[in-house]
A protein has these predicted regions:
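Alpha-helical transmembrane segments within multi-pass membrane transporters and channels
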Residues: 24, 57-101, 108, 242-247, ...
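Residues that define the loop-to-transmembrane-helix transition and helix capping
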Residues: 37, 61-62, 92-93, 162, ...
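Helix-loop-helix "hairpin" substructures at the membrane interface of multi-pass membrane proteins
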Residues: 13, 135-213, 237-243
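Transmembrane helix-bundle core of multi-pass membrane transporters
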Residues: 85-160, 187, 211, 253, ...
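Membrane-embedded helix boundary and interhelical linker motif in transport proteins
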Residues: 8, 30-77, 81, 86, ...
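Membrane-interfacial amphipathic/re-entrant helices at transmembrane-helix boundaries
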Residues: 1-20, 48, 56-63, 89-94, ...
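Hydrophobic core segments of alpha-helical transmembrane domains in multi-pass membrane transport
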Residues: 46-50, 68-74, 99-107, 146-155, ...
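Transmembrane alpha-helical segments in multi-pass inner-membrane proteins
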Residues: 17-21, 57-69, 192-199, 203-269
């Protein structure tokens, strides 16, 4: 493969990681929660796509809409059932709950669908397009475009809308935001909805690229997306995108030089190096806390 082809592959994989990392960074930025069930929400979205297209024989467009809607509703439900009752509990309690929700979703999917991988039909024609002797994958181009548009919309919502201002107020000081008349629980639920919707989009793009759904597919995908969020500076939207692209490029280029068995190790090594040099991540900011 040519260098430019590898760059395109890195952009495609990095875009998927970036979308998932955005979900992590949104939730952490509001309530300082590492939602370890986030990767499993992607798994649910992939299974929804498989059911709609393979089992029901419906259109890919409907599969996309139902996957995003299903992930959004699941994210809000998880917040209401598992996290909202622990809003004032110690942070460790919520973290353990998040891990429990993750295991529940994984084992529930295995119980319902079995451990074998389900083949998700391709959404679009995957035949490569040749431009100036460069093989361009329609799936890769669509993935990059969707991620760019999703990031732009998310940035606009957070920076320019009333609800986005409420989200930023809650992230700065939840108590003060409540005193100013902001409905904190509604704001947090909306944050989960947005993060989970991004996970649904990520599920669709991942299914397009790899054409399969398994109960544990969200584990490594979610872990690497979390690494991407931390690399870029968790809580930062541009940081999540930069981190996702770094992880994607690292994986692709390590595989390209024949060291694919080391690609996961290189990703985590990259995280260690960045945190040693800049513990807050590339675009993260240092925060002081009075005790």
């Amino acid at each position: 493969m040519t260098f430019l082809t590898q760059v395109l592959n890195g952009l495609q994989l990095g875009s998927i990681y970036a979308l998932v990392a955005l979900g992590y960074t949104m939730v952490y930025g509001i309530i300082l929660l590492l939602n370890f069930a986030h990767g499993d929400i992607i798994m649910v979205g992939a299974y929804i796509s498989w059911i709609v297209m393979s089992q029901l024989g419906l259109s890919p467009i409907l599969a996309v809409l139902l996957s995003v809607a299903g992930c959004t509703l699941l994210g809000v439900l998880i917040d209401k059932v598992a996290y909202a009752p622990l809003r004032n509990a110690p942070r460790l309690s919520i973290l353990i709950t998040a891990i429990g929700v993750s295991y529940f979703l994984e084992n529930g999917a295995q119980l319902v669908f079995g451990a074998d991988a389900k083949v998700v039909p391709s959404f679009i024609d995957s035949s490569a397009i040749e431009v100036a002797n460069l093989q361009l994958s329609p799936t890769a181009l669509l993935t990059i475009a969707v991620t760019a548009v999703s990031t732009a919309i998310l940035t606009f919502l957070v920076q320019r809308t009333k609800l986005g201002k409420a989200m930023r107020a809650v992230s700065e000081d939840m108590g003060a935001a409540r005193l100013m008349g902001i409905n904190v629980n509604t704001t947090i639920s909306f944050t989960f909805a947005m993060g989970s919707a991004l996970a649904g989009i990520g599920a669709v793009l991942y299914s397009m690229a790899y054409s399969q759904a398994t109960p544990t597919m969200g584990v490594m995908l979610g872990t690497k997306a979390f690494v991407a969020a931390v690399l870029g500076g968790i809580g930062s939207i541009p940081g999540a995108v930069i981190g996702g692209l770094l992880v994607g490029f690292a994986e692709v280029f390590v595989s390209a030089i024949g060291l694919s068995v080391w690609k996961d190790a290189v990703v985590f090594l990259l995280l260690i190096i960045v945190l040693i040099v800049k513990p807050t991540g590339i675009l993260g900011r240092t925060m002081s806390e009075k005790v």
